[in-house]
Structures are given as structure tokens and as C-alpha cells.
């Protein structure tokens, strides 16, 4: 039988709660404000939040719980343990993880890297090996692996190179300051020239084969050439010592007998160490900001300048009197530096004893002025740049430092540097020597150079390049000035190559001269002569 209500919509069923009135404490009633006693400003806290903890609840502190040790840790060894079977188990070969096992490979060293390390390849991946020379076959233990390269050290020399020699330094394996000390000096010059060619080929579009790259100018005596040192003072082996920290470690290498430093500096460092230890001096404490932090020694001719970087307590008068009494010391200074940054000249130097300036040739140099690291090669640099300049050319020099090279050139020169003390020394030397064709300007080097190139037409521009290289503003200023002659001086091969890449569309590279300013290291001082196309 068919239903009569089939296909008809049913009436909506009424809720059983529709006839109820809203509660006074409900959200609906409160929003309507039906009761004045339940307005927002008169409503009190809910009773749930006012509940007090049970008084009869006895909560013991955590420390009062008696923790019993687990029985698993108290198990005694089995009395029926079979030692024979254990020995048989130990005799079986075990599998160690890759982290605990270091790999060894025999490789051929192809070339030198920019830091003096040997470069080889394992399965087409590059590996950098310390104390390895080109054309050597060595056994290498891999210390580090990444996706792009590997690091390792030599465990055995299978076929040593003919260029290898004894480093003749007790601290060579720990210091790493002279990365090429194990190579003959003549071979060092050859490999540095090849390294320069590789860098130019990598970063520029120049035809390296067609460039006039002169052989590297070396030193007559490639030992004891460093005339300035700056070392931390630290407590080591029961006494105060000066030295350098090893690369990527916190281990100290003593530097009072370094073959790269002058013999006068080495002997003076030993005497200063003895004086500091005899007076029970303390090294720098970063927490209390007290103690001796750094020692700076500079040799200018036969004169020796000594400067201390200390904490808030300075340095005692007894120590300064004993150091000043040394025959070779001509000036003694100190400065305070308690910041985390190792800035030697943060607050300026205070003179304790001696002269305010040191005499170098015909020039006077103050303690805060830029100092010459290798005087022999600095003189060679001045001669090479003088040979590239025409005496009639008007020159703008960037980054002149204390202006010693500019003062020795015969050209009319405007020189710029950001060190105000160096510019002051250069200006005073020019006045004293009555050199009217020299002008020294203090300020931001790139900004001042752009200003002078815009307002005056110069014949030549000397750029003493920094690690940052050439900025876009300076490149634009050089382009708009139309200057015809450029001379770039740089200590960094990669930075120099990138700068030449920026200039190669406007200038031709005439000559590249390399000076071995720091023997036994992979660094060179490079002079590039460019002429506008």
C-alpha cells in the first residue's frame, strides 16, 4: 500500500530548547546586556579560577624521592663466561665506521695552490695537501671530505721533487707562516710566476701567452727580511711568551727565533720575554680586562720601536724602565685596547720613552704611520715604477701610505690616503725636504680620487690596490676621466686579476712586473702597466 505523504516535504521539527530563556551567565545573554549585574565592568571572576589546592594533598619534593638504581646496572659477570670463545671472537675481523677509519691514497701532485699547498686529484675530485710539491708522488691521508674538495696530509713521499729541501726551521710544522720553506728559492720564483699566469687565465679574458710577464724579481738574501712584527702575549709552558696561533687552532707557536724576522728583532724579543717573566707580568684576561695583550716591534734602519697593547691596568714602570735601558730600544709606547677587535691603534699610542719619530733615509716616521715590511723590495718597487713613468707626467697616487715612494719620484704628484697620521708625516717630510711638487691629501681614497679625477686632468694614475679591489664608482670615474696611463700595485693575485678584467675593454696591458716581497710565502707584489686603447 502506498504511503500518502510520499514525495511531500516534512515540516521542520521544533527544537526542544527553543522555549528556554537564555542563561544570565551565557555568552548570548551577556552580549545582549539583558541584566545590568552581568555587564563587563561588574562581572567578577569565575569560580573555577578561585579554587584553592587541597589541604590534605601531600606533595613531596622531588629530591626526597628515594631513587633506586636499576637492576640491569648491578648485574655481575657470568661465572661460566668462556674466555676462550671471547678470544676467538676478538680475532675475527671487525667492520669500523667511515668516521673512525681514515683513507689513504697515492696521488700525483699537479700544481701549487694560492696558499702554497699541493693540489692533486682523487677520482676527479681536488685534494689540497700541505707540504707537497708539484711532480711529486705522495701517500696522503684524507683528513676532511666535502662535496667539492678534500684536505689531507702527507704520510710518505714516494717520489720526492728535486726542488725539495730541508725547511731549516724548528717551528715549521707548527707555524705554517712560510708555506714554501721546503722548496728551493729559485724554484719558488718559477712556481709563483706560473701561479700568476693561472690566476690571470682564470679570472680574465686576456691571452696570457701574449702578455709580457717578467720573471719574478727575487731577493739576494731571502732570510731575515721582516722589519715589523706584532704578536699576542700569552702564558705558555709556565711563562709569558710571544708567538702566533696556528691556523684554525688555539695552539701557540713561539716566534722569538723566526728565520724570516731580522736578527735584531729576534734577540730583542728574547730580552723582552725575560724582563716580563722576571717581573711576574700577567697576560691579558678578557673577563677582568687587565694584562698584557700584544707586542709590536719595528726596526727602522738601526732604530727599534717597541709598543705594548695592554688592558685597563697598563704596564708597570719597573718593566718600562728595564726595557728602555736596552741599548737597541730607541722608543717605547703603549696603548689600551679592551675591545674584542684586535685593533692596535684604537685609542692612539702614548709615549713612555724615547723619540717621537724614527729616521728612515731622509724621512721621519711616527709610530702610527705605515711601516715598510721589506725595505730592499720597497726600494726595488720605487725603481720599477720610476722606470714606467715619464718625468713630465702629472700623477695621482691612491693609497700612498706614508708617501715614501711618492717623495722619491721626480714627478708632480697628488697622493691620497685614509690614514691621517701617515699623511701628516708625508706632508712634514715634503716641507722639510722642500719638495713643492708634492701634495698629500687625507680622506676616503675612492671618494677623493673621484673628486680629483673630475676636477683635474692627470697624465697617470697609480693605484695601490687593497683586498676589496676596485669599486664601481672608481671604475666610472676612471672611464669618464679618460686618463691614458694606469699603474696598478697589488699584493693579491685574485683581486688584481678581477680588476684587470674590469679594465681590459678600455686598457691594454703592457708589462707585468712581479716582486718577491715575502720570500718562502706564496704572495707576490705585482706591478701592472696599462695604456688606454
Pin down the residues of each PLM region:
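Basic Arg/Gly/Lys-rich low-complexity intrinsically disordered segments
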Residues: 1-112, 176, 181
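Terminal RNA-binding accessory module
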Residues: 2, 89-167, 171
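Rossmann-like S-adenosyl-L-methionine
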Residues: 38, 49, 57, 65, ...
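Short, acidic/hydrophobic/Gly-rich beta-strand patch recurrent on exposed beta strands
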Residues: 118-123, 243-246, 529
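Residue-level recognition of short, solvent-exposed, well-ordered loop/turn junctions
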Residues: 133-134, 224, 390
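Extended interfacial segments that mediate partner engagement and assembly in macromolecular machines
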Residues: 156-167, 174-285
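Internal alpha/beta scaffold segment
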Residues: 252-294, 312-334, 340
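Short, aliphatic-rich beta-strand segments
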Residues: 299-311, 363-367
